[in-house]
Each structure stands twice: as structure tokens, then as C-alpha cells.
Amino acid sequence: MKHTLIASFVLAMCLAAGSAQADKLRIISWADYVPADLIAAFKKETGIDVELTLSNNEEMISKLRATGGAGYDLAQPSQDRILAAQREFGIYKAIDLTKLKLEQFQPEFLSIVRKNTTLDGKVYGLPYLWGTDGLVVNSKITKVADYPDLCRPDLKGKTAVRLRRPTLMAFAFAAGKDPFALYGDPKAYGALMDQVGATLIACKANFKFFYDNKDQLLNGIRSGEVVAAMMWDTGGWTLNRSNPDIQFIVPRSGALGWLDTFALPARGRNDAAAYAWINFTMRPENAARVIKSVGSFSAAMNTAPLIDPRLKAQFAASFPNNDLKSIHWYPAIPPGLEEMEGRVLDRVKAAN
């Protein structure tokens, strides 16, 4: 009888633990991507609690690599960071597309992400949010049309960029090169990065600072210390709301486009909740909540009528006629390129 009671107790504890796991979804994502009101609505509809960990691309890869893909049920890396990490570390599992309402996704974004996250015929990412990097300028003080304008003599000490790979890509495109087309040629890519590094070193006196976070740049532009900078679209539109002279513009050489995704960690323990969350968040009314929270645009269908008219007007001013053809979308990064870029960025940082 005693053994029976012990066995029954152990079984009950196991069932309780399993139930607890089934009632929790562990997400690792970016700030503002998973707003509290969306979590509450999901809990009300499904009974599933959401445990959120804030992170970024580098941390997501590091955490999932350290655990072999355990600890989370859903991750939200950028599309260009998935394949290299999967090839090298195996930190994700393939997505079962039959469990998703694919009609809720805008076809063009679904196509881009599937192309850049498919390995051996299996899909590892789905689109969530997108945005661009371009130029922000105080048009009352100066005019700029492309990234090299940040290096003009009259703007010495008055511009800013982030010392990260997007800046390398931006200046490469501005030089008339396509860095993405050279991903398969490490020698040519390295030569291009060296060229861009030399350009940034020659321009270094123009940079008031290399910004590390959004507040540093936003405050620098608000104060007038910085009059033009490489910046993300929503930051520019935020500044524009308080000062119409500050505008986000698409550079002559094109904007850089990013797409953040849904991805399933390899050892996630609640795929059912992850699929439920994806289907839930891609409904137009729920995608609109996310847009309101983060200020970026969703890959969900039918959100346009639900977006703040002011945000739509700002987008239209930056992208006339909804022209997205000038956007250079980040493709998957092959292994080894980021180390090459890192050495170039280190040289720029160390240069006098």
C-alpha cells in the first residue's frame, strides 16, 4: 500500500509538472515586441501564461548555444542570423507550416524569410516585424542625400553612426558596391570591408560619437549636437513627432531592410503554445497592438486600417507611393563574415 501511495504521488507530481509546462510559453524577444496587453489577451483566450525574456540577436544565439536550444519555446532572431547559427550549433528546430495560418502573413515577407531561413528543405523562420535603417537629418540645419554626406567638411563633429555591421553595409552600398552579392566570395568581401573601413577612419572626425543605444542618439539629435545620422526609421519618426524639421529619409543608395522572425528553439518543450501564439499575434487586431507598442511594421495581413494615421503619414513621407524597391533586405550571413567585419570595426574604433 505504501509503495502504491508513493507511486501515485510521483505520478501526480509528474502530471502536474507536465500541465504547468503546457500552460506556459517561454519567449525570448526584443524590447516592446511582446506588449503586456497582448500577453493578457492571449492568457484570457488560451489560459497559457507567457514568460518573457528580453534580448537581442547576439544574446539569443549565445543563450541557445549554451543550452543546446533549451530554456525557451519561441525566439525572435533577425532572419539573417538564423541559418549560420543553425548550421553551426543546431539551436533551432524546423517549423511545421501545417500548424500555422499562413494566410495571415503578407506573401512578400513570407517569401523573403522562407528563402533566407530554409536549410535542407526545412523552414526555420517566419516573418514578424520589419523596418529599415536610413538617414535622419535636421532639415532646418543641413541637407543630406546619402551616407557619404555624413563625412562632408561642414558637418565635422556633428554626425553619428553605430559602429556595427549595418554601417559597413550602408557605406558599401553608397560606394556603388553590393556587399550581399559578395557573401560567397570571402576574398572580395574582405577587400570591400577594408575599403569601407578606410572610408570610416577618414570620416572619424565627423562623428560626434559612435552611439551604443537609442537614447544616446535620440538625445544627441534633440539637443542639436548631432544634425544628421544613420538611424532606424522608427527613431526618426519619433523625433519627427516632436520636431517636424527632423526627418527620416531613404538614402540615394537605398535603405537597409531587416526582418525579425518567429523561430522554434531546438529543445523547446511547448511547441503547441508557440504555434498558438504565432497564429494569435498575426491576427490583424493583435498585430496592430504590436505596431503600436514598437512603432515598426508587421508582416501580418490587413493591418493598414488599424495603424495610427500619423505613423502612416510618416511612412508615406519617407517611402513615397509605398515604394519598397529601394530596400536592400539582409540575406542570411554565411559563417566567418562577422569575424571579418569585427576586425574592420575594431580598426575603425582604434584609429585616431
Report the location of each language-model feature.
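Bacterial N-terminal signal peptides
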Residues: 7-16
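Early extracytoplasmic/lumenal segment of secretory-pathway proteins
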Residues: 23-85
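Extracytoplasmic ligand-binding site segments that recognize negatively charged/polar headgroups
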Residues: 76-218
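A bilobed periplasmic-binding-protein/Venus flytrap-type ligand-binding module shared by bacterial periplasmic
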Residues: 134-141, 174, 259-270, 289-290
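Conserved C-terminal helix/tail region of periplasmic/extracytoplasmic solute-binding proteins
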Residues: 321-352
